[in-house]
């Protein structure tokens, strides 16, 4: 939609979180008439921002006023099955996400990243690479979307030469119909948010695949060829109008594949373009303590592919990768206290993310896990837990389910708080061993978000450090 068409249009914004308030501000600046409607209580900071913008809002439920709109912008935390959204659709009111709305205003090049795991690290890597290149080439790189800053907050200041690096969740993509990234990256797809998608991984995948639904000739799609679901989709449903670039850990697996790829061979990251393969940089220059594991190598390959597709200079890519030390709350090394290494993996909000962490940390660890369950199948990692974990300390709403799932596999202790869990882990850990905090659940039962959860874990560990 042309933003000019929004002048004078009544728009209901459902949800008064960060993205909802940002969307309302963008709409107001375009001359639309937004109304923000929050089912719960509007936070004081959000209320102050909306008053400053002159945006009306309501809280404690959705009034009949919201259905007087021509357009509805829905916040990512609100499912399409919510009664207010169903009523919008029943009345013929168009429902879009904040990402879709902001894309109508975007003049910059867009690199969109989605997937179950790795999207934050990949988006962070791509942003830092583009930022380093932009400092020399005279453009700016913006890090927006699910990574923290709403797209709507920054889009008005973007110029055509700039690059918007968007981390995108399935929730944000659900409401996209014309959103068209110049470069789309899919890291992987494994079961997550099954509570929202009725236990159907294919429904979840369809939301993720909306990232490329509007891509055309001249655009690029990058996907993890080692992921079975992604491979089946892109090899089975083509041909595609856009360019396809594959990534994977073994270059020999691409024999007979005509498309470009980024992979690994003989300890080097290698790139094939137009049938020619080049050694790009040694893997050892990228992977280091604090940033290790196959899952992070996948993230690096996706970042290299995206940077090459965006025309970023190779020296900026190599320099940024060699300097990268990881992302907070993603297998973050907190420190060695009481003779034990403590690792904060609070961003692990599903079983597959926990699996990746377990594969990286040495055997004999104590595992702290739990939170608000998302339809997790813990049985799928029982053998790995038996191999790598000495005991589990379970927290949150899911602690009973976790205890039941691993009964007979390893000892499980239940803790009423994260602070108590840290103390139990300290008592249980072996000298020279590790404690891994990898919840495999969402944080909203006990914390405001995974970042709050991770910070509280680190604080509890440091408070205990005087043992």
From Swiss-Prot:
Q: In which pathway does it act?
A: Cell wall biogenesis; peptidoglycan biosynthesis
Gene3D superfamilies reported for this sequence: Mur ligase, C-terminal domain (3.90.190.20), Mur-like, catalytic domain (3.40.1190.10), NAD(P)-binding Rossmann-like Domain (3.40.50.720)
User: What does this protein's UniProt record list under function?
Assistant: Cell wall formation. Catalyzes the addition of glutamate to the nucleotide precursor UDP-N-acetylmuramoyl-L-alanine (UMA).
Q: What is its EC number?
A: 6.3.2.9
Q: Name one Pfam family in it.
A: Mur_ligase_C
Catalytic reactions on record: UDP-N-acetyl-alpha-D-muramoyl-L-alanine + D-glutamate + ATP = UDP-N-acetyl-alpha-D-muramoyl-L-alanyl-D-glutamate + ADP + phosphate + H(+)
Q: Which cysteines are joined by disulfide bonds?
A: none
Enzyme class, broadest EC rank: ligase
Q: Name one GO molecular function term.
A: ATP binding
Where does this protein come from, organism-wise? Chlorobaculum parvum (strain DSM 263 / NCIMB 8327)
Keyword list, A-Z: ATP-binding, Cell cycle, Cell division, Cell shape, Cell wall biogenesis/degradation, Cytoplasm, Ligase, Nucleotide-binding, Peptidoglycan synthesis
Q: Does the keyword Transcription regulation belong to this entry?
A: no
Tell me which residues bind ATP: 115-121
Query: Where primarily located?
Result: cytoplasm
* Record-linked NCBIfam families: murD
Q: Which gene encodes it?
A: murD
Family (UniProt):
Belongs to the MurCDEF family.
The name on file for this protein is UDP-N-acetylmuramoylalanine--D-glutamate ligase
UniProt-listed HAMAP family = MurD
GO terms for biological process, alphabetical:
cell division; cell wall organization; peptidoglycan biosynthetic process; regulation of cell shape
């Amino acid at each position: 939609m042309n933003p000019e068409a929004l002048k004078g249009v009544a728009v209901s914004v459902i949800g008064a979180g960060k993205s909802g308030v940002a969307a309302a501000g963008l709409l107001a600046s375009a001359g639309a008439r937004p109304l923000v409607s929050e089912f719960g209580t509007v936070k004081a900071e959000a209320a102050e921002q909306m008053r400053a913008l002159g945006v009306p809002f309501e809280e404690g439920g959705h009034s009949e006023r919201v259905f007087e709109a021509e357009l509805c912008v829905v916040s990512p935390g609100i499912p399409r099955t919510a009664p207010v959204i169903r009523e919008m659709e029943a009345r013929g009111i168009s429902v879009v996400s904040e990402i879709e709305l902001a894309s109508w205003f975007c003049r910059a090049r867009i690199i969109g990243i989605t997937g179950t795991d790795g999207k934050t690290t990949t988006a962070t890597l791509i942003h830092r690479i583009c930022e380093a290149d932009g400092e020399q080439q005279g453009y700016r790189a913006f890090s927006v979307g699910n990574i923290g800053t709403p797209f709507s907050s920054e889009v008005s200041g973007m110029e055509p030469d700039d690059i918007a690096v968007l981390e995108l969740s399935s929730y944000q993509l659900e409401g996209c119909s014309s959103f068209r990234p110049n470069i789309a990256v899919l890291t992987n797809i494994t079961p997550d948010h099954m509570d929202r998608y009725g236990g159907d991984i294919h429904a979840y995948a369809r939301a993720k695949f909306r990232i490329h639904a509007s891509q055309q000739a001249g655009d690029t799609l990058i996907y993890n060829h080692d992921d079975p679901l992604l491979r089946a989709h892109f090899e089975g449903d083509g041909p595609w109008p856009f360019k396809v670039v594959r990534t994977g850990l073994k270059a020999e697996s691409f024999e007979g594949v005509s498309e470009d790829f980024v992979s690994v061979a003989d300890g080097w990251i290698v790139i094939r373009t137009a049938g020619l393969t080049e050694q790009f940089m040694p893997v050892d220059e990228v992977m280091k303590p604090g940033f290790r594991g196959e899952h992070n190598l996948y993230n690096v390959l996706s970042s290299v592919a995206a940077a090459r597709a965006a025309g970023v200079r190779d020296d900026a890519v190599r320099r940024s990768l060699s300097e990268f030390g990881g992302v907070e709350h993603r297998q973050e090394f907190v420190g060695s206290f009481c003779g034990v290494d403590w690792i904060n993996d609070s961003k692990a909000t599903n079983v597959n993310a926990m699996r990746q962490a377990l594969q990286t940390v040495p055997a004999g660890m104590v595992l702290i896990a739990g939170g608000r369950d998302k339809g997790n199948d813990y049985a799928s990692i029982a053998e790995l837990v038996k191999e790598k974990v000495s005991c589990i300390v379970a927290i949150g709403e899911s602690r009973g389910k976790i205890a039941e799932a691993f009964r007979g596999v390893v000892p499980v202790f239940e803790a009423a708080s994260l602070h108590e869990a840290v103390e139990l882990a300290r008592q249980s850990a072996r000298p020279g061993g590790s404690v891994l905090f990898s919840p495999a659940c969402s944080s909203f039962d006990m914390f405001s978000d995974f970042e709050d959860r991770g910070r509280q874990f680190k604080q509890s560990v440091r408070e205990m450090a005087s043992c």
